[in-house]
Amino acid sequence: MDIQTTGILVAGGGIGGLAAALALSLRGTDVQLIEQATAFTEVGAGIQIGPNVTRILRDWGLEAGLRRVASFPHELVARDARSGRELGNLPLGARAVRLYGAPYACIHRADLHQLLLEAVQAQGVSLRLNQRLVEVLALGDEVTVRTEQGL
C-alpha cells in the first residue's frame, strides 16, 4: 500500500488523531478524519510537552502558534508536599534547546488541540463530526468502516 496515493481515514479527533492526520497530509496523503463528537469543545487541562514533540511541531510549521499559546519554563522543581523543601530540579530553557534542539513547553490541552485543528483544516483534511464508528472490516489491503450515521 502506497500512503502517498491511497486515502487514509483517521478515526478520532483528539490530539493524537489530529496529529496523525496532519503528519499524513503533510506527506501529500489524502486524509479524512471522523470524530464522534458533534463539535470540538474545550476539554482537559495543562499538559507538558518535551523537546521531541516541540521539534515535531516546529517541523510541521506550528512553532509561531505554539509560541503564542504555550509557556517555556526555565526549570522544573520537585518539592516535598508537606515541607516545601526542594527535592530536585531539572534545568530546561536554553539548556533543553542546546541539548535537544528544541524547548520544553507547557500548554493547555485545548490550545494544543486548536493549533492542530487549524493546521489540519489549512491542509485540507476532510473533517466529519458526529460520526460514531461501529464497524471496521479489513480485507487484504482495503479497510471498510461503518458509522452509526451511515458513512
Model-identified regions with their sequence ranges:
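Conserved N-terminal helical subregion
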Residues: 2-8, 25, 52-151
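Conserved N-terminal Rossmann-fold NAD(P)-binding element of oxidoreductases
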Residues: 11-12
